[in-house]
Structure formats: structure tokens, C-alpha cells
From Swiss-Prot:
Pathway: Amino-sugar metabolism; N-acetylneuraminate degradation; D-fructose 6-phosphate from N-acetylneuraminate: step 5/5
Enzymatic reactions: alpha-D-glucosamine 6-phosphate + H2O = beta-D-fructose 6-phosphate + NH4(+)
Reported function: Catalyzes the reversible isomerization-deamination of glucosamine 6-phosphate (GlcN6P) to form fructose 6-phosphate (Fru6P) and ammonium ion.
GO biological process, one term: N-acetylneuraminate catabolic process
UniProt KW keywords: Carbohydrate metabolism, Hydrolase
Family to which the UniProt record says this protein belongs: Belongs to the glucosamine/galactosamine-6-phosphate isomerase family. NagB subfamily.
Primary enzyme class: hydrolase
Protein name as catalogued: Glucosamine-6-phosphate deaminase
Species: Bacillus cytotoxicus (strain DSM 22905 / CIP 110041 / 391-98 / NVH 391-98)
CDD domains documented for this protein: GlcN6P_deaminase
Pfam families: Glucosamine_iso
EC number: 3.5.99.6
Active site annotation, chain numbering: D63, N129, H131, E136
GO cellular component terms given for this protein: cytoplasm
Length: 262
């Protein structure tokens, strides 16, 4: 696992963009796994600013709320259109359909999409309770795309995006942890003190379904971009053990970048 320590959101965005640019420019028809929420906003802004050629890129999104219309400003369909899809051309874009009449069938359909479009680089944030995607604590590490009931802590974390508390969805459709782990490369971004406990568990916690992010300890190609606040609870020894690269140039020249996961 590589750790890249940054001083600001701007530096995080620049570093994340460089990783994505490297994949997009080095592969013929890459697939990017996209995340939503506040964590990747700066990265998406960099993609827009640099007018990255994404005409050959396929995207697959991690998750979507259930029973939230696609045109709702808080849906992840809307988020992706606002951040990227209305600004740049893509070969194909996929977001789970939380409005599907048969949600179990939608989960199966989405797994088929993932099988047909293996992810070259998956972007992840990390929840305060260690969730990745909407995979809450206790989710089996072998899980595939599924419907999840959101925990109260996750709903409260997303409350700020909705006018009223009762408007916050109670369920979501999400790529499973097993689905996420199939990505060839994973980029996890974390900023601020609220993420410190989760990042500590990721780096030095026990490999356990009680903290979904700890599954990444077993992935062969993970890069964590974080600031000092997000790393503030980690022991220096643990941080140094994982801090194998120090600059984005070092990271891009590292022979493991782009390796296929087992």
C-alpha cells in the first residue's frame, strides 16, 4: 500500500488526477470506477480543467440511492452528470439504477456490466465508520452488488445534502466489497480529522468485516492520498511502513502502478 501525504485539497486533487491521467493515457480502452460525495470533487474538477480526453473511457459508479429519481439533485446520476458527464464525452457510463422495479435483477445486471468492463482504477472515499461504497460494517468481504440499508451514522453524514432529514434515503444499491476488490488498482482519498479513525483502522487495524476498508490490506495495488489530519491517529511506525513513495512522480514510475490484482 502506498501513502501519499498532501497538504491541501488542491494537492490531493492534482495527485489523484495524475494517477487517473496515467491510466487513461496508457490504456487503449480503460474503465474507471467512479465515486461520489465530497472526496473526489477536486479530482473531477481537475479532469474538467485539463480537458482530459475521455472519449475512449468507460466509467462504472460505485453506488446509487434507492427510490431517488435520477433527476433529483442528490442522486448520483445527477452528481455525475454535473461533475463530468455533461462536460466531457465518454465511451460509456454506468450508474446503478436505484429506480429499477426489480432491484435484485438490477444487482445482477450491474454485476454483468462489471464483468464485461473490468475496472482499471477504482476511486474510493472512506466513511467515518470505515465503509467503502455503501458497504457498511459487517458486510461480507466476498459480497457482490447488493441492496443495503444505510446505517444511521451514514444517513447523518449525508444529511447536509438534503433539505429535510426524512428526505435522506434509507437504502442504496452498491457494488459489493468483492466487486470492488476486482479492480486492478485502487485510489482511496481521505481528508480531515473526521476520517482519522477510519484511516487508522485501514492502515493498522485488524483485517475484519467490522471495518470494510480493512479489506484493502489484502489488495496488491492500493494508493492512499491523505492529509496529516486524516493520518493523525496513525502511529509513525505504521505510516512509515506503508509510505513507500513520497511524490506523485515516484508513484507514477513505480513498477506496481497498473499491475493487475490477483
Amino acid at each position: 500500500m502506498n501513502i501519499l501525504v498532501v497538504e491541501s485539497q488542491e494537492k490531493l486533487a492534482e495527485a489523484g488526477y495524475k494517477l487517473i491521467e496515467n491510466v487513461v493515457k496508457s490504456k487503449g480502452n480503460p474503465t474507471l470506477g467512479m465515486a461520489t460525495g465530497s472526496s473526489p470533487l477536486g479530482i473531477y474538477a481537475e479532469i474538467r480543467k485539463n480537458k482530459l480526453d475521455t472519449s475512449h473511457v468507460t466509467t462504472v459508479n460505485l453506488d446509487e440511492y434507492v427510490n431517488l429519481p435520477h433527476e433529483d439533485k442528490n442522486s448520483y446520476h445527477y452528481f455525475m452528470k454535473e461533475q463530468l458527464f455533461d462536460h466531457l464525452p465518454f465511451k460509456a457510463t454506468y450508474v446503478p439504477n436505484g429506480m429499477a422495479n426489480d432491484l435484485e435483477e438490477e444487482c445482477n445486471r450491474y454485476e454483468g456490466i462489471l464483468a464485461a468492463n473490468p475496472v482499471d482504477l477504482q476511486i474510493l472515499g472512506i466513511g467515518e465508520n470505515g465503509h467503502i461504497g455503501f458497504n457498511e460494517p459487517g458486510t461480507p468481504f466476498h459480497s457482490r452488488t447488493h441492496i443495503v440499508e444505510l446505517t444511521e451514522s451514514t444517513r447523518q453524514a449525508n444529511r447536509r445534502f438534503f433539505e429535510k432529514e426524512e428526505d435522506v434515503p434509507t437504502h442504496a444499491i452498491t457494488m459489493g466489497i468483492g466487486s470492488i476488490m476486482k479492480a486492478k488498482q485502487i485510489l482511496l482519498v481521505a481528508m480531515g480529522p473526521k476520517k482519522a479513525e477510519a484511516v487508522k483502522e485501514l492502515l493498522q487495524g485488524e483485517y475484519s468485516e467490522a471495518c470494510p476498508a480493512t479489506v484493502l490490506q489484502r489488495h496488491p495495488n492500493v494508493t492512499v492520498i491523505a492529509d496529516q489530519e486524516a493520518l493523525s491517529l496513525c502511529s509513525e511506525a505504521i505510516a512509515d511502513e506503508h509510505r513507500q513513495v513520497f511524490t506523485i512522480s515516484d508513484l507514477l514510475s513505480d513498477s506496481r502502478v497498473g499491475e493487475t490484482a490477483n
